[in-house]
């Protein structure tokens, strides 16, 4: 029977003890009562005053409506939404009606007042309605298309997908209303619209469920949406006039509100038009929450907080415009007094957020915990037992800062972060596999990245050297970036995602559904790469190991070139995001103009993107999460903190080491991962350290360190600093089942999400029962073998302590030590097997696999 199978029965009790000890469609216009939702309303006596928004209402036409926002100021200063809880009274009883949720609907022409009252407090709202009985013109793009968007008709899963649905296709999310109008009104000989009998139009019959519809019933016949579409069809289904106003932006009220848990808040959304008019579109906009564990939102614009504290952003989208409402939800419990020293600028803004949310930070991490955390986060390497012992016993109050400075100057830091950047810069040999010429370029680019990190090359220069690279890999290794990317679209996608923290690939084909970026924005960026030229140059072999001449790719800037905007087929003008069109002379490289815009200190994306990326590396979650999806509708959990980190980077002349020091020298980074009663549910405020699984390369190297059994990687270039280390590998072409099963990325995208961090069964089985791990445990000259060598006369207690220091950077607890010694006592004649078993148990604990 193989050793690894014999090992199992004897290990169950010991491993069990050790593992256990390790750290570880439109809705009806009715609002439910507060009591039915578990909401505790304020006592009338606690309400100090009432405020209303808007302060007056003007309605035009029978289709118009307005949402009232009633806010109470309570005795303790808190604000409470009462929009659906006050009593509404219309003074003349006829001009308008007010729903229980506070929606004002015109009934007849005239002027009156609405009185909103709660207990003995009341407020009056003037209201005027006109042209209620007139059939005002309807604009297809402004009024009909938003209905299709709200009901999901033009979503990617329905008629908005590229192939359409059941023979009917309209533009995704209504971004091309002219095309939609033709498809709806004129295609198929106009069979979808029946102007002479609107209610018999196929459009309305399917939407109302009169005729079978794969998407089910979308409208009720008495709904506002049905009535408006019916009136539009009856009016001849017009598109509208060229002089009709168009939407320029949307706004929301309120923009932010501090809410208690299990509460609700109504907001209102407004469209601003080119003619200066403003329209309430609360019931026509589309909503989504970025964190439904904290807050949800319904179709009427009512936000409901749940049982968790934190912050949630509610996206409101209307005709390609987006805006967000932010809900801050404190824990709402009485907390003990606490003080938090500001070791770096980080602590100022994290501690303020904890106060806002009613959180209490965890204690400072123990020295042993910190040293392991720091070594893994900065170097991808475990500290040795001596390094742990020396650090823990050191009485210098500045020892943590000094260790940080020391590790930042280590070769392992450069290798580890070179590996991180190589992932998203797609440093690989690609389809050519072990082709020598491609391998040389890959190694050269990897070495260039490593040297740049080791020498703390200013980040703006780092990016400029990559994006503006010319020549060949022998003289300018960053030109290798242009080997894997061939089309302007690829350059735009990777540039935006890696260096600006933006995912704008959607705008290649259509307006971005969750951002303001249009196809014009996308192709304006692509135009900067239109003049890239490539040519192949054959050179003689440079060393005896090469067989024949080598072909090099030379990158240069052409005097002319363009890309066509997919939207209109015309040549796109060079234009940076949110910037005006640029003219670039024929003797200039457009890429340099793009980089000039990117690295400008006023650029709203560049510094924040890398600051957020580095923060995510150390904390496991970005201030903006996902870390490369920075957009209005995915706001930072702590915008002031992100601004401060970006400013720090700029002020340091784009020193990445300075950025790292600002983060890891903070007390926030050095907090314990052990939660308290106040932060145990925190997932976004960093009131405690969030444990992280070790990445594939780091885990393999750690396993090799603990077992003292290095992994051999065939063909690895010689290196004087860290030979035979996974974090040293220049690309993904080195065969390793271990690295693949633990989530090593193949570098086929610029997204860090390609690296898999989730656990799976294959990983567990590989650690438990693979030949690879077994061979490392049993290797002659390995850790277990050395511990039983006659030259090592130390008692078993010291040897067990050493193993724990290697694996966990701590000594064993009394229970750990007792279990280990009892296990060794059962193997007097085969003590090496006993130590192999203990190592095996250590490697299979969460404490080993996680950085905490």
Model regions: which residues?
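Extracytoplasmic soluble-region selector
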Residues: 25-150, 159-160, 164-166, 170-171, ...
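Primarily short, surface-exposed interaction patches in extracytoplasmic proteins
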Residues: 338-412, 423-718, 749, 753-755, ...
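Structured, non-catalytic alpha/beta "coupling" segments that mediate domain-domain communication
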Residues: 113, 117, 235-238, 306-326, ...
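Globin-like tetrapyrrole-binding proteins
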Residues: 838
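Bacterial N-terminal signal peptides
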Residues: 9-21
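Long, His/Glu/Asp-enriched segments that create or flank divalent metal/ion-associated functional microenvironments
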Residues: 707-717, 725-728, 738-743, 749-766
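Sequence context surrounding c-type heme c attachment/ligation sites in exported
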Residues: 126-181, 192-193, 197-200, 209-230, ...
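N-terminal secretory signal peptides that target proteins for export/translocation
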Residues: 1-7
